[in-house]
């Protein structure tokens, strides 16, 4: 029997259900509900596999990526530059409020993945944009594709911004230079272009996400090393740093001498004690960035369905376990990195945690290794994040065309070119966290999964007033409220000029 070619969207069975691994698909379906023909969209064609040892079944086309590799892929899709901004978020919320918000965002992210998987199971669609088309037609598809594109361009921009800002510091440390030299290899703009062309682009040209699982595991190892270093440095970095206390007291001269005298005479340093006391609940103008930073840090939803498609022996339960495990691992890493980063610098922490360590010792070997690890991690993450953006472009512009390597290469090259231009002219990384986290992230996490589920789930199974659908609508309303509030506060912060964007370079 000839097996139909499949891409991100698999067969719709006649009764509208996603029968996991039970239904032969050789017979054409009779479902008249709205869907799009994606058999010519070559973006995903290379990773859907056939089982050679038995009759073709529904899941035989789904791929060969293992459970562990899928966890690596999804964890790496979650993990990114957002981890560097969480200590700054904690400094502007306090430990207790931060923990509450982080837990809420993690749980809501898991619930939204549940809605996505349930929706895809009903109609047999494995692409985020196609769920939008199935629910609302072309406007839904375009809205989903636009949100995915904006989110992932923002994510890749933040990754490349880290390369732009941190790689010159690494080279400066290796060359043992007190001040950056005015040469091309110390210019972050040249370096980010060089890394994009020599490392990121070749990885981005792969047609299978599964192969990137090995780089995913390596980059996750780099971030674990980053976390260990942050925890270790908490007990090595003195508090307060001389310049932090000087800023707090206005005494920019003789600060170290004054501290030493106070210690010798047994006098309490009230300024130091105040600076080095953690806050448990804080509200200020920068608190508006907290939820966008967290939302930005947990977005992985466009990658869930492609990873589900490539999963070996896929089922909704198995993919939900993968999602829950990935979110749980990232939740622990995020909280520990934020906590120990905050307890190291307190209110002196910058929006990019790693840059704050340059105030301690620019030539510290451990921090140098951490910088290298983070650079490797974000560099290897870019190709995974680029995949759904390219797929969205394929879905919008080249729906019914055969796969073309030329188009495949041109899309990746064009995307990286545009992102490099954004990074070269971007003033800071906090703006990327804030805007993307307050616009596309709430759409992808809260609003779209809920309204897609509400429209796709048949009313004969779940009436419009059923508890699951009411919860889904409430979920969408919460997302819209968070998006509106966060974006409003951020704009007010920009207009008032009170934003203190740490970590600029």
From Swiss-Prot:
Any one GO molecular function term: L-histidine, sodium:proton antiporter activity
Disulfide bond positions: 239-276
Compartments reported by the entry: Cell membrane; Basolateral cell membrane
Recorded catalytic activity of this chain's protein: L-histidine(out) + Na(+)(out) + H(+)(in) = L-histidine(in) + Na(+)(in) + H(+)(out); L-glutamine(out) + Na(+)(out) + H(+)(in) = L-glutamine(in) + Na(+)(in) + H(+)(out); L-asparagine(out) + Na(+)(out) + H(+)(in) = L-asparagine(in) + Na(+)(in) + H(+)(out)
Ranges that cross the membrane: 82-102, 105-125, 143-163, 186-206, 212-232, 288-308, 325-345, 367-387, 409-429, 432-452, 472-492
GO terms of biological process kind: asparagine transport; cellular response to potassium ion starvation; female pregnancy; glutamine secretion; glutamine transport; histidine transport; intracellular amino acid homeostasis; L-asparagine import across plasma membrane
Keyword terms, alphabetized: Amino-acid transport, Antiport, Cell membrane, Disulfide bond, Glycoprotein, Ion transport, Membrane, Sodium, Sodium transport, Symport, Transmembrane, Transmembrane helix, Transport
Site, as annotated: Modulates L-glutamine-induced conductances and Na(+) binding: 76
InterPro entries attached to this UniProt entry: AA_transpt_TM (IPR013057)
Tissue spec: Expressed predominantly in liver, moderately expressed in kidney and brain, and barely detectable in heart and muscle. Within liver, expressed in hepatocytes. Not detected in testis. Expressed in cells of the ganglion cell layer, in soma of some cells of the inner nuclear layer (at protein level). Expressed in the inner segments of photoreceptor cells.
Composition bias, Basic and acidic residues: 33-43
Induction of the gene: Up-regulated during renal ammoniagenesis and urinary ammonium excretion. Up-regulated during acute acidosis. Down-regulated by chronic treatment by insulin in hepatocytes. Up-regulated by acute treatment by insulin.
Glycosylation sites per record: 73, 247, 251, 324
Membrane topology value: Multi-pass membrane protein
Function: Symporter that cotransports specific neutral amino acids and sodium ions, coupled to an H(+) antiporter activity. Mainly participates in the glutamate-GABA-glutamine cycle in brain where it transports L-glutamine from astrocytes in the intercellular space for the replenishment of both neurotransmitters glutamate and gamma-aminobutyric acid (GABA) in neurons and also functions as the major influx transporter in ganglion cells mediating the uptake of glutamine. The transport activity is specific for L-glutamine, L-histidine and L-asparagine.
Protein name: Sodium-coupled neutral amino acid transporter 3
Organism: Mus musculus
């Amino acid at each position: 029997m000839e097996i139909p070619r499949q891409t991100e969207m698999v067969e719709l069975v006649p009764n509208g259900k996603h029968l996991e691994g039970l239904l032969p698909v050789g017979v054409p379906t009779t479902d008249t509900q709205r869907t799009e023909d994606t058999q010519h969209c070559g973006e995903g064609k290379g990773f859907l596999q056939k089982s050679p040892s038995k009759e073709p079944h529904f899941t035989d086309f789904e791929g060969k990526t293992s459970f562990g590799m899928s966890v690596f892929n999804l964890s790496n899709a979650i993990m990114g530059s957002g981890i560097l901004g969480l200590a700054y978020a904690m400094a502007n919320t306090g430990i207790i409020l931060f923990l509450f918000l982080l837990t809420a965002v993690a749980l809501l992210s898991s619930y939204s993945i549940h809605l996505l998987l349930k929706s895809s199971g009903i109609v047999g669609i494995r692409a985020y944009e196609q769920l939008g088309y199935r629910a609302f037609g072309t406007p839904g598809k375009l809205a989903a594709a636009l949100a995915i594109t904006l989110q992932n361009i923002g994510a890749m921009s933040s990754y490349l911004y880290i390369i732009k800002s941190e790689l010159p510091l690494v080279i400066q440390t290796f060359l043992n230079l007190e001040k950056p030299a005015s040469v091309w290899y110390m210019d972050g703009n040249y370096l980010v272009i060089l890394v994009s062309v020599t490392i990121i682009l070749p990885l981005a040209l792969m047609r299978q996400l599964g192969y990137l699982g090995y780089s995913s595991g390596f980059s996750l190892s780099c971030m674990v090393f980053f976390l260990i270093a942050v925890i270790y440095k908490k007990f090595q970095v003195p508090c307060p740093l001389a310049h932090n206390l000087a800023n707090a007291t206005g005494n920019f001269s003789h600060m170290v001498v004054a501290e030493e005298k106070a210690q010798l005479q047994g006098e309490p340093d009230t300024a130091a004690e105040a600076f080095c006391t953690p806050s448990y609940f804080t509200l200020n103008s920068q608190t508006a960035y907290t939820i966008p930073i967290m939302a930005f840090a947990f977005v992985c939803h466009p990658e869930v369905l492609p990873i589900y498609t490539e999963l070996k022996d896929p089922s909704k339960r198995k993919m939900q376990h993968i999602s829950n495990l990935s979110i749980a691992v990232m939740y622990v890493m995020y909280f520990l990195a934020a906590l120990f980063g905050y307890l190291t610098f307190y209110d002196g922490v910058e929006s990019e945690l790693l840059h704050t360590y340059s105030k301690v010792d620019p030539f510290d070997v451990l921090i140098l290794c951490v910088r290298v690890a983070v650079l490797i991690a974000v560099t290897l993450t870019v190709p995974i994040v680029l995949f759904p953006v390219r797929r969205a472009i394929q879905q919008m512009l080249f729906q019914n065309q055969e796969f073309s390597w030329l188009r495949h290469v041109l899309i990746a090259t064009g995307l990286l070119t545009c992102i490099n231009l954004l990074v070269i002219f971007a003033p800071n990384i906090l703006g990327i966290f804030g805007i993307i986290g307050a616009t596309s992230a709430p759409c992808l996490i809260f609003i779209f999964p809920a309204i897609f589920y509400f429209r796709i789930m048949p009313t004969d199974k779940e009436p419009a007033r059923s508890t699951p659908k009411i919860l889904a609508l409430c979920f969408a309303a919460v997302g819209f409220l968070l998006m509106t509030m966060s974006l409003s506060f951020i704009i007010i912060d920009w207009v008032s000029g009170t934003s203190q964007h740490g970590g600029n370079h």
